[in-house]
Amino acid sequence: MMNAEQVQAAVNQVMPFGKYAGRRLFHLPEPYLVWFKQQGFPAGKLGEQLALMYEIKLNGLEQVVAPLLHND
């Protein structure tokens, strides 16, 4: 179970590589997260954050976590 700080960190984490490098995980398209789910999320913290974003989008919870986005 993740706490609020971990959810906020995941929402604001910047994708470090790939086609969507530089985008916040919150803004990754759902098909990209589905692809990661099928191929396997990377190991470590980033993989956990991507898996969380997959679950958020899968369950339609974007509006719930959107207020956690930083405006920088």
Range-by-range predicted roles:
Residues 1-72:
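DEDD superfamily 3′-5′ metal-dependent exonuclease/proofreading module
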